[in-house]
């Protein structure tokens, strides 16, 4: 708890408390004031490692996702645009998770994404990097050695007319001979089990 107080004192509120390991915004806390800090202390199990980060007041999140081969070369990359942030979805159960694959990527996002992948030096892995998109730049949120969650790989496949798990298998066993991607937009929208919707899935 002493480290929490040191972090709050050094970084100043508002902050985001995010676990070292996790998916989406699960077990993530927004610390706006002292009451939030005390609540976080009470709910923290005392063993899970957390990062304290300055809170960025921005609702636009984009990703740089893809796969690297055995030498660390990127064999494909794409980008997801979130309609709602993961934290908004966690805090507001009236919202549904909606995102789309962007066909035309900003060169600056690609540059930042490629530099991030190179810096971590990973091999034979998917990567999923999240950024806040500001008016004219990007702020890195997190780097994950996995695909984006939920239906993301299905959306990758539909948008690019391929099977990325097959591509991963070919990369892993050394039979990958390149990828001819037919890039399109792709959209995913999820539904909450406990809500009634006007239209059915069909």
Model-identified regions with their sequence ranges:
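Active-site nucleotide/adenylate-binding loops and adjacent lid/helix of ATP-dependent enzymes
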Residues: 1-58, 69-73, 99-111, 115
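Peripheral (often C-terminal) accessory segments that flank ATP-dependent C-N-forming ligase machineries
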Residues: 4-7, 167-202
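Short polybasic/polar patches that bind polyanions
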Residues: 9, 118, 158
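A residue-level signal for beta-strand positions that form part of recognition/binding surfaces
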Residues: 14, 49, 76, 183-188
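Pocket-edge structural micro-motifs
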Residues: 19, 32, 54, 78-81, ...
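Short, charged, surface-exposed secondary-structure boundary motifs
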Residues: 25-27, 87-88, 200-201
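Phosphate-binding core of ATP-grasp and ATP-grasp-like enzymes
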Residues: 44-49, 55-99, 107-139, 144-153, ...
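ATP-dependent carboxylate-activation loops
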Residues: 146-167
């Amino acid at each position: 708890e002493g480290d929490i107080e040191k972090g709050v004192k050094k970084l100043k509120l508002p902050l985001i408390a995010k676990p070292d390991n996790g998916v989406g915004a699960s077990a993530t806390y927004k610390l706006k004031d002292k009451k939030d800090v005390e609540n976080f202390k009470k709910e923290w199990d005392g063993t899970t490692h957390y990062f304290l980060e300055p809170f960025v007041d921005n609702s636009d999140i984009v990703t740089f996702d893809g796969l690297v081969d055995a030498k660390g070369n990127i064999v494909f990359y794409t980008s997801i645009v979130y309609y709602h942030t993961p934290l908004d979805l966690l805090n507001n159960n009236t919202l549904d998770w909606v995102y789309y694959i962007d066909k035309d990527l900003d060169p600056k996002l690609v540059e930042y994404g490629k530099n991030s992948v190179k810096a971590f030096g990973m091999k034979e892995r998917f990567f999923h990097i999240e950024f806040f998109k500001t008016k004219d730049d990007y702020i890195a949120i997190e780097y994950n050695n996995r695909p984006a969650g939920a239906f993301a790989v299905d959306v990758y496949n539909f948008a690019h007319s391929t099977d990325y798990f097959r591509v991963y298998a070919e990369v892993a066993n050394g039979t990958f001979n390149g990828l001819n991607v037919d890039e399109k937009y792709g959209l995913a929208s999820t539904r909450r089990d406990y809500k009634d919707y006007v239209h059915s899935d069909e």
